[in-house]
């Protein structure tokens, strides 16, 4: 059984009810988590780790924003109203993170998408990001992220510019 996109206190209540009633345990949490949206690190990820619940993040590539240089637009980015609500509030700091992601991609010989996914996979409790691909070659590219191990200093370089974001994605 899995849960998705809720506040940590809500999930803690659900976990408690599950235990009280002897119901099947929660084994996964689908949450909004990526290099430019890390609010889940404050409460949800520690709760999941403590409870042994695997995290399967949605939007691991920030709706494509982590796959290309920051100012580069696509038809999807221009027309994606959900993406604008999720990410446009924090453009300046996110641009710094994306720039550093690009440097790490060059340094490792990997793509930006592979580095972003490798970062996620380096986090305790993250089992597998929920990826989306519209072409077979995209899927093949993304799957290679499991073989990429980032150095601690590379992770720190990408994480340092992060600033707190408004919580989005659920009510």
PLM region spans:
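Beta/alpha (TIM)-barrel catalytic core signal, keyed to glycine-rich beta->alpha loops juxtaposed to Asp/Glu
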Residues: 2-160
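A short beta-strand-loop micro-motif that forms or neighbors metal/cofactor-
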Residues: 162-164
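Substrate/cofactor-recognition hotspot
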Residues: 168
């Amino acid at each position: 059984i899995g849960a998705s996109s809720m506040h940590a206190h809500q999930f803690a209540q659900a976990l408690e009810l599950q235990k009280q009633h002897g119901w099947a345990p929660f084994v996964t949490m689908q949450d909004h988590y990526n290099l430019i949206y890390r609010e889940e690190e404050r409460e949800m990820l520690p709760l999941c780790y403590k409870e042994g619940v695997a995290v399967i993040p949605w939007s691991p590539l920030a709706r494509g924003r982590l796959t290309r240089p920051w100012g580069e637009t696509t038809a999807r980015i221009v027309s994606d109203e959900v993406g604008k609500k999720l990410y446009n509030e924090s453009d300046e700091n996110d641009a710094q993170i994306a720039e550093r992601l690009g440097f790490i991609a060059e340094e490792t010989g990997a793509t930006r998408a592979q580095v972003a996914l490798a970062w996620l996979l380096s986090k305790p409790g993250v089992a597998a990001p929920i990826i989306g691909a519209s072409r077979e070659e995209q899927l093949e590219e993304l799957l290679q992220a499991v073989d990429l191990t980032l150095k601690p200093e590379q992770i720190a370089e990408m994480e340092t510019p992060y600033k707190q974001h408004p919580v989005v994605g659920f009510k």
